Amino acid sequence: MAGLKLQAVTKSWDGKTQIIQPLTLDVADGEFIVMVGPSGCGKSTLLRMVAGLERVTSGDIWIDRKRVTEMEPKDRGIAMVFQNYALYPHMSVEENMAWGLKIRGMSKAHIEERVREAARILELDGLLKRRPRELSGGQRQRVAMGRAIVREPAVFLFDEPLSNLDAKLRVQMRLELQHLHRRLRTTSLYVTHDQVEAMTLAQRVMVMNKGVAEQIGTPVEVYEKPASRFVASFIGSPAMNLLDGVISASGDRFELPGGLALPIGADYRGHAGRNMTLGIRPEHIALSSQAEGGVPLTVDTLEFLGADNLAHGRWGDQKLVVRLAHQQRPAAGSTLWLHLPEHQRHLFDGETGQRV
């Protein structure tokens, strides 16, 4: 197995504006890292830099302890799986999987052995003579993965491989990818805009925004302790509730526009007078009562999701979303009294957006 290291890597198209800010990442042997972020955040550009399809402006890339920054893609020991499968339509499944090995001059027996083994792992044994047009979307994606597997690369690179599949098939393919990684233990770098893919597949997640790695951590870490307001808003469905306000002069209240306020602990007294953003996830808000000092939420709409429900409403001028149990279905216009547990709240600096 082999590791991957990015050392202060940057990318600029015009020599002035850096679309990838200096970024350092160490991927351990056999680790599965997912880069996630909105369109235009730089994740696919970074993946292409690792693959050698984009030139690195500055910094270095290391694969299997070898510096590959200026190497051609074919010499880097990588295999890439694309969003659009990139299969040859006139070739059979077997020929598609074997083609890369054939042009490298491998023996016929060696090629056949690798293709048969990959087909067995991916359950493609009975499809080897078919053409891509005779396959479903999921089968085509498995062929694309098989073509990567037969190369026995040091690193797998996945560029949004499930984006073209329907919702049900994406779930199935996520499970297959998890099983495949447990079996092969090959170092993998995976790009997606889908946070569900990121959270379910990754051993560590790198959340990107405007060319910056906002946070690198386990799925649990980025969910429970988001490093910035951006991460808090991007990870989680529905998104975290974010309320802009200020720490009171006494340091014991979080004050919001319209005379609203929430008590806060003594830990934040050193931030008195500072603008802050308070965050809390919809699933961490509990039902309370007026007598218990609950926050009144006027329900605007209710989303019925089956297993649970989402109530969207207003607390004064502040918008809030709360996740409710299946049997709790408040009518529009009704009032819910809510408890925002202090240990489930997050505070972010009002200027930098960084976690306090």
Curated annotation (Swiss-Prot):
One Pfam assignment: ABC_tran
EC primary class: translocase
Keywords: ATP-binding, Cell inner membrane, Cell membrane, Membrane, Nucleotide-binding, Sugar transport, Translocase, Transport
Record GO terms (molecular function): ABC-type glycerol-3-phosphate transporter activity; ATP binding; ATP hydrolysis activity
A GO CC term assigned to this protein in UniProt: ATP-binding cassette (ABC) transporter complex, substrate-binding subunit-containing
Subcellular location: Cell inner membrane
Reactions catalysed according to its record: sn-glycerol 3-phosphate(out) + ATP + H2O = sn-glycerol 3-phosphate(in) + ADP + phosphate + H(+)
ABC transporter domain segment(s): 4-235
InterPro entries in UniProt: AAA+_ATPase, ABC_transporter-like_ATP-bd, ABC_transporter-like_CS, ABC_transpr_MalK-like, ABC_transpr_MalK/UgpC-like, Mo/tungstate-bd_C_term_dom, NA-bd_OB-fold, OB_MalK-like
Self-association and partners: The complex is composed of two ATP-binding proteins (UgpC), two transmembrane proteins (UgpA and UgpE) and a solute-binding protein (UgpB).
Protein name: sn-glycerol-3-phosphate import ATP-binding protein UgpC
Species in which this protein is naturally found: Salmonella choleraesuis (strain SC-B67)
Gene that encodes the chain: ugpC
